[in-house]
């Protein structure tokens, strides 16, 4: 993998990184940088474990991340509902992979119902666009009895 890094003065460095598929990239960001403002989830999933947590825990446990940068860097799963077409194009352009996607169902109407997000069904078009571009994806589902088990 080759990373192109642009320094604040405009100088560009190409860094070659050799790693196994399952290994972390090994990149850490300083405070005040790229990863300060994580994107929070806009869904209200019927199965969300964060919504089911007891009160009184530390605040960081209640943060619902849905950030594609965390998927690529840390292996977090995203629903694609918080990603713009620009975000998808950037993943394709820079070939950022693998991206981990929380799918739940391929039925757009059922996906909207499960995620309580009227735009959740549109994310399947983004999934297809990533597939067509050859982006490696890992998928997961939360199986809800009587809802998405067929």
Which residues make up each language-model segment?
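PDZ-domain C-terminal substructure recognizer with occasional recognition of PDZ-binding tails
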Residues: 2-29
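Conserved Radical SAM active-site core
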Residues: 19-150
């Amino acid at each position: 993998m080759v990373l192109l890094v642009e320094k604040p003065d405009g100088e560009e460095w190409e860094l070659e990184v050799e790693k196994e598929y399952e290994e972390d990239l090994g990149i850490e960001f300083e405070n005040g940088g790229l990863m300060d403002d994580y994107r929070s989830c806009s869904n209200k999933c019927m199965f969300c474990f964060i919504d089911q947590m007891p009160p009184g825990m530390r605040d960081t446990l209640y943060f619902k991340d849905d950030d594609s940068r965390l998927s690529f860097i840390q292996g977090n799963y995203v629903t694609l509902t918080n990603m713009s077409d620009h975000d998808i194009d950037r993943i394709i352009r820079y070939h950022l992979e693998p991206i981990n996607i929380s799918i739940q169902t391929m039925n757009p109407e059922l996906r909207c119902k499960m995620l309580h997000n009227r735009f959740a069904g549109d994310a399947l078009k983004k999934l297809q666009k990533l597939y067509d571009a050859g982006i490696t994806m890992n998928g997961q589902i939360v199986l809800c009895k009587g809802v998405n088990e067929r």
